[in-house]
Amino acid sequence: NSSIRQRIIAQFHEWMTGAGLLYLKSAMPQVGCVFTTHATVLGRCVAGNNLPLYSEMKNYVPEELARRFNVISKQSLEKTAAHQADCFTTVSEITATECAHFLDKEVDLVTPNGFENVFTPSEAEWEGKRKAGREKFLQVAQAILGRPVAEDALILGISGRYEFKNKGIDVFIDAMGQLNRNNGLGKE
């Protein structure tokens, strides 16, 4: 029971939300739909396979790439969502170039990735937040290992989308292996 006067906007991020956008466009056309991509399906495939993305982009034929990497459905849904959205956005100028080529659609707006300063604690709060965060990490490590962990243990975390090469998880694991083998830090 919504009307055009209510000015409702729905935000959809990445290809996997595309079906929701398409459904809402059909069921409630009075709702404005924004589709945002942080990288394209094909861009992730190219980069994840150690192929040159931006220097060779103009030579890639999107349909051929989608077939090659077996992502035809994902790429099709992403492209359709981008074209059907009332507003299509991405997070950087370079990704806008990727969208124009792989999705055949210019973005309407670039909404830069990042955090506002209000998300970062003040200098006065920083040390307390760091200590509280470290304590939580130690509790998690002890729960996972089922044993006490030294207070000065080296605790590292990594987060983000699971893209082994694109996000550097392979490099992170290799670096952790080197630290483990060398134990030059003299810490657990």
Can you annotate each of these PLM segments?
Residues 1-188:
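Catalytic cores of nucleotide-sugar-dependent glycosyltransferases that transfer UDP/GDP/TDP-activated
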